[in-house]
Amino acid sequence: MALLKVLRFPDERLRTQATPITEFNAELQTQIDDMFETMYQEKGIGLAATQVDYHKQLIVMDLQDEVERPKVFINPEIIASSGDFCNEEGCLSVPGIYAKVDRAEFVTVKALDRHGNEFTVEADDLFAICIQHEMDHLKGKLFVDYLSPLKRQRIKQKLEKAAKQDAK
């Protein structure tokens, strides 16, 4: 397994729309394993393939609870949603930044597992938030896009300043 580089906002590659996965081969299995390793190293609970410059519809998640063990979502699709929920979110691609985002409280998602088997899952609370957040990445959307242009600009400036400090 290998650690992958997580793209950071405002990297334009984060805006790339992911394409469906059609082949379930050894390369895909390695990509999934590498994404899990990267997510754990970065102390995240979810990672979309676009965040590691792999523009396919692939998400890995581990909420580290008893019910929802590590999950792989390939070509995910929300088939039902209800309720409204506002919660603070963060993102591995926008490090150190947290903001409140409105999302559906409950979602039902249809996807394929790492072997191409279809499954459906109902999610609420953190699980629902994480799924919606990661699925946004597959569409080239970030949680900061839900914020005002002024807040987005401040975040961009803060991250650019931090990147310059890290480069020194």
Swiss-Prot record:
Superkingdom in the source lineage: Bacteria
GO molecular function: metal ion binding; peptide deformylase activity
Cofactor note text: Binds 1 Fe(2+) ion.
Record GO biological process: co-translational protein modification; translation
Enzyme Commission identifier(s): 3.5.1.88
Catalytic activity annotation: N-terminal N-formyl-L-methionyl-[peptide] + H2O = N-terminal L-methionyl-[peptide] + formate
UniProt cofactor(s): Fe(2+)
Residues engaged in binding Fe cation: 91, 133, 137
EC top class, as a word: hydrolase
Pfam family, one: Pep_deformylase
Keyword Protein biosynthesis: yes
Active site location: 134
PANTHER family assigned: PEPTIDE DEFORMYLASE
Family of this protein: Belongs to the polypeptide deformylase family.
Function summary: Removes the formyl group from the N-terminal Met of newly synthesized proteins. Requires at least a dipeptide for an efficient rate of reaction. N-terminal L-methionine is a prerequisite for activity but the enzyme has broad specificity at other positions.
Listed name of the protein: Peptide deformylase 1
UniProt gene name: def1
